[in-house]
Structures are given as C-alpha cells and as structure tokens.
Amino acid sequence: MALDPAVKQQIIKEYATHEGDTGSPEVQIAVLSRRIKDLTEHLKEHKHDHHTRRGLMGLVGRRRRMLGYLQNVDIERYRALIERLGLRK
C-alpha cells in the first residue's frame, strides 16, 4: 500500500530541516512511521494478510535502524523527533 503523494508531501514539509529536504533522518522516519501506521490499520481489518505483515516488519526494522543512527549522531534531534512522533512512551 503506497502512501498518497499529497500526504507524503505534507509530512515532508512538516518534518523538513531545510527547503527541499527529503532525505534527512527526521523526514525518512516520519514517512516510515505514517506507512507503519497505515499498514497496522490495514492488518487490524485483514488479520491473515501475512505478506503485508512481513512488509510491515521490514519497515519497522528500517525505522529502528534509522532511529539508532539518529540517536548516535545527534541525541537532541532524536529526542525531539520521538517526542513529536509520539514514539517511546
């Protein structure tokens, strides 16, 4: 399930660190988080869709690795991002 381009652009605009920023860890993690949320909702309805579940696990792993990278590079940006996204209760 692809993310709607308008929604993706809105997320990019919201989390970008500068004009034209699409590759910063903050933007990538925010986009992944939205895709993870959408797939989680899909799996609540379609419990036996194991192909999607496997894709979801890949996205969760990718987000976890990016969060680890951001934590090692700049702990303040990491803390601000997890606060904004509502991760890590």
From Swiss-Prot:
Single annotated GO MF: rRNA binding
GO cellular component: cytosolic small ribosomal subunit
Recorded superkingdom: Bacteria
Keyword set, alphabetical order: Ribonucleoprotein, Ribosomal protein, RNA-binding, rRNA-binding
UniProt xrefs under InterPro entries: Ribosomal_uS15 (IPR000589), Ribosomal_uS15_bac-type (IPR005290), uS15_NS1_RNA-bd_sf (IPR009068)
CDD domains with a match to the protein in the record: Ribosomal_S15p_S13e
SMART domains hit by this protein: Ribosomal_S15 (SM01387)
SUPFAM superfamilies: S15/NS1 RNA-binding domain
Family matches, as Pfam families: Ribosomal_S15 (PF00312)
Example GO BP: translation
Family statement drawn from the similarity comment of this UniProt entry: Belongs to the universal ribosomal protein uS15 family.
Function as written in the Swiss-Prot or TrEMBL entry: One of the primary rRNA binding proteins, it binds directly to 16S rRNA where it helps nucleate assembly of the platform of the 30S subunit by binding and bridging several RNA helices of the 16S rRNA.
PANTHER family: RIBOSOMAL PROTEIN S15, BACTERIAL AND ORGANELLAR, SMALL RIBOSOMAL SUBUNIT PROTEIN US15M
Quaternary structure annotation from Swiss-Prot or TrEMBL: Part of the 30S ribosomal subunit. Forms a bridge to the 50S subunit in the 70S ribosome, contacting the 23S rRNA.
Protein name (Swiss-Prot/TrEMBL): Small ribosomal subunit protein uS15
Native species: Micrococcus luteus (strain ATCC 4698 / DSM 20030 / JCM 1464 / CCM 169 / CCUG 5858 / IAM 1056 / NBRC 3333 / NCIMB 9278 / NCTC 2665 / VKM Ac-2230)
